Amino acid sequence: MIFEQSGAVKRDASLADSGSGVGTAVVVPEYLEKTYWWAYTHPNAVRVFERQWLVNLILWGNFSRLRDLALEEMGEQIDGNVLQVACVYGNFTEHLVRRLGPKGHLNVIDVAPVQIKNMHAKLSDKRQVSILQQDASAMQFADASHDSVVVFFLLHEMPVDIRRKTVAEALRVTKPGGKIVFVDYHRPRASSPFRYIMVPILTTLEPFAMDLWNDEISHWLPSGHACQRIEKQTYFGGLYQKVVITR
């Protein structure tokens, strides 16, 4: 399969949900097109990476465990408004949809038209789902519009300025008392072989990921933020972390 890098892709209005209320154009960021075109923005990327076994392999067999740890934070049944930031390869969204109660609704956003199209294709039941092209660092939702927000393996793919804005936006759109759930990379313990195995992998393929080894996710919260609680747990020898912020 041949991958040929293309230029920046602008918003494809035909892929946006008609009820999104999106009023401004969304453009794929330059950093994403330059750094991750092979994984997210190229049309052939989906054909390569949208394989459950592959995303599980990339996470060293931990995909299902980390997925379930994130979703358990939202409860067995979700009756509120939940936001998934970025489409995510694998069956993460399908499992989230299964938790939606009669009054639950899921908004899924992604900046890449290729990912929006893929999400439409892989979700068979979209009755309680809106799939919207939006920039995570400049969301077009009202303040305090969601009961919970989940950000699954996205922060490590962002330069620090975009990451900081995305964390602030996730906080902004969450209702007081609601949860923001982050799952991402973390610095492994010194005794873990992945402390050494992952360095060349991440520095080669994920140039922003080492930030998650060097700083806490809470480091990127906006100054003066008001949070009730911040909880952190690590997994698989410390290579992965779950951070739950209660707004």
At which residue positions do the language-model features occur?
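A short SAM/SAH-binding and catalytic strip from SAM-dependent methyltransferases
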Residues: 147-161
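N-terminal, positively charged/glycine-rich alpha-helical extensions of SAM-dependent methyltransferases
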Residues: 1-51
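Short glycine-dipeptide loop
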Residues: 79, 102-103, 174-179
